[in-house]
């Protein structure tokens, strides 16, 4: 059985792992997933991630999740916005801060995958992949 939305699968795995208070979660590797995880690390939502080869030519990403000193997860909400069936695009004019600048949109632009803050600085819009708070 093939998976139609691999990014939604990754976000769901992260959400479920944090609800279960796990320290690590594994997801299949792709360059797009790595770029999204780079943004999550830069913005402080996850601690780090490591790519390792499971079998010959098949790579997996091991994500180290981040929690507050009280044990609460840093990610309160992580949801897919643009899906394979319904793409959502925002121009720079319509790109507003998410959750009063406490959360971010992760956007795929012509200059790469980045947070909404970075996209506003560069003056570019694009496809809204997901929102994180």
From Swiss-Prot:
The keyword ATP-binding does not apply. One of its GO terms (cellular component) is ribosome. It holds the Pfam family Ribosomal_S8. GO terms for biological process: translation. It comes from the Bacteria. Keywords: Ribonucleoprotein, Ribosomal protein, RNA-binding, rRNA-binding. InterPro entries: Ribosomal_uS8, Ribosomal_uS8_CS, Ribosomal_uS8_sf. GO terms for molecular function: rRNA binding; structural constituent of ribosome. Belongs to the universal ribosomal protein uS8 family. Part of the 30S ribosomal subunit. Contacts proteins S5 and S12. One of the primary rRNA binding proteins, it binds directly to 16S rRNA central domain where it helps coordinate assembly of the platform of the 30S subunit. This is Small ribosomal subunit protein uS8. It comes from Orientia tsutsugamushi (strain Boryong). The gene is rpsH.
